[in-house]
């Protein structure tokens, strides 16, 4: 078997669909505190998307109807790193964000699931166990 050269060298952005771009921009910018780095807009047209920086990957919110794509919220969460899940959760709850269940302690990390205004599943995440100490590290 001949191996092909690895064509993919990284992840440029993760797309998040939205039905209401202005509401979604406000949520990611003001509620989550992410830095907006771009607004996608053709001259004379309505905006069709925006990008937010997380420090490791860009989140691109897209008005999918403007791209001819039917809206479907993400049901697999995007995990946002935070230093303290409990503190970040309390801050978001004080802003009106509703969480799905209690904070999870997996033995490796803490995480808390919530949704953006369009129902896209998001996750506050903090890994407290170094990867070498993970229970499944020997199996991988």
Predicted regions and their residues:
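N-terminal beta-strand motif that seeds the catalytic metal site of vicinal oxygen chelate
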Residues: 1-25, 76-78, 128-140
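Exposed loop/turn and edge beta-strand positions of beta-sandwich/beta-sheet ligand-binding modules
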Residues: 46-48, 74, 108
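Vicinal oxygen chelate
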Residues: 18-22, 78-121
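Active-site beta-strand termini and strand-to-loop segments that position acidic
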Residues: 51-55, 114-117, 127
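Conserved beta-strand in the GNAT
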Residues: 60-62, 113, 123-125
């Amino acid at each position: 078997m001949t191996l092909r050269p690895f064509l993919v060298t990284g992840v440029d952005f993760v797309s998040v669909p939205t039905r209401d771009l202005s509401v979604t921009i406000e949520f990611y910018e003001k509620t989550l505190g992410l830095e907006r780095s771009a607004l996608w807009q053709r001259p004379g047209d309505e905006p069709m998307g925006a990008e937010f920086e997380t420090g490791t990957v860009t989140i691109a919110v897209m008005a999918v109807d403007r791209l001819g794509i039917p809206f479907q919220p993400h049901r697999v969460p995007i995990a946002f790193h935070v230093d303290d899940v409990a503190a970040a959760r309390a801050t978001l709850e004080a802003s009106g964000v509703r969480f799905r269940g209690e904070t999870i302690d997996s033995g490796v990390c803490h995480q808390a699931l919530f949704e953006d205004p369009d129902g896209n599943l998001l996750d506050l995440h903090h890994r407290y166990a170094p990867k070498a100490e993970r229970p499944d590290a020997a199996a991988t």
